[in-house]
């Protein structure tokens, strides 16, 4: 999974869950670390509103991700010069890793099951 410092909120939570469940390799840069939320906010007399975070993510290890982000397994920085040159080092590294993993763990071939006949059959 590609991650970087511009990812926050769901962009923090999804990589955290991906890592927690050991689903694959995180490639890129540490995520932003913004994973608190706001539920319900009062409307002021002038029609404006005020918000304050009142939802956070906790696990058995305690408070997670907020202000820390999710670190990648393989850190790859993407510089403006790379983008200008038409390169994406993070994507290139992720593809390289995925191809290596496919060699080590080739996908299983799956046989499509026969579909059951559910239509009424003529009597013989």
Give, region by region, the residue ranges found by the protein language model.
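C-terminal "post-core" interaction segments
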Residues: 1-124
């Amino acid at each position: 999974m590609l991650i970087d410092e511009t990812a926050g909120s769901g962009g923090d939570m999804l990589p955290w869950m991906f890592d927690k469940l050991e689903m694959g390799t995180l490639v890129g840069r540490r995520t932003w670390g913004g994973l608190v939320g706001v539920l319900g906010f009062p409307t002021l007399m002038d029609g404006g509103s005020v918000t304050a975070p009142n939802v956070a993510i906790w696990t058995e290890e305690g408070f997670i991700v907020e202000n820390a982000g999710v670190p990648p397994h393989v850190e790859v920085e993407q510089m403006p010069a790379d983008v200008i040159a038409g390169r994406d080092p993070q994507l290139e590294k992720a593809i390289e890793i995925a191809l290596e993993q496919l060699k080590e763990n080739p996908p299983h071939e799956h046989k499509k099951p026969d579909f059951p006949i559910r239509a009424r059959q003529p009597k013989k």
